[in-house]
Amino acid sequence: MMLRARALTAVSAVAALSACSQQGELVIDQGVGIASVLTLCPAVGIPDYTGDVTTFGPGADRSVGSLDVSAAMTDLRATCNDTADKVYSEASFTVNARRTDTRGARTVTLPYFVTVLRGGSAVISKRVGQVTLTFADGQDRATGTGKVGSFINRADAALPEDIREKITKRRRAGDTEAALDPLADPEVKAAIARSRFEMLVGFQLTEDQLAYNVTR
């Protein structure tokens, strides 16, 4: 399973940031062309190739003619509470599915995962859940919903005080440091990376299902 996404989808950075309280944010705007927002809340998204799942009928045929059920994860929405010692992030999503054989009512259960990454690669936690979809007789479409949540230690998501001071230090026009972006400082960049978390949601795919998504 590829957990690290090349790009996060479904939830924009603006939405992720606006979900957090103002007390948990570090707003940087010193009037020298530097403006940024650092938040205790994790970024939320769907890793590449894990937002869709396709199942096929018996046998090794993977052509369109043998397709059984296809489903897509969409409408991912996140909220975050960063006022306690444990930062709690919650996300809800919708799964839209379609089947090829519409004869009879049918219930399909699809597994999904939620994982928390720190610094872009370290897996802090992972859990697997299920979403159930019910197709009515004669219908080719069904919809299901899911909800996930994760806790993050507030202390781990907060920047050390010395790093905050480096970032928020007031820079006056004409100062040598005025033209320098504090976020480009290697020490600052490393500290920010350690404090950045992601909560990623996607279908729990088999190796064959993942390979199909990558190559189609």
Predicted regions and their residues:
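Bacterial N-terminal signal peptides that target proteins for export
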Residues: 1-10
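C-terminal motif of bacterial Sec signal peptides marking the signal peptidase cleavage site
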Residues: 16-19
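Bacterial signal peptide processing site
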Residues: 21-24
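Post-signal peptide N-terminal segment of mature Sec-exported envelope proteins
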Residues: 29-56
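Short, solvent-exposed beta-strand/turn "edge" segments of beta-rich domains on protein surfaces
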Residues: 61-69, 77-89, 99-106, 120-124, ...
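Beta-strand elements of well-folded, non-transmembrane domains
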Residues: 75-82, 91-101, 112-120, 135-137, ...
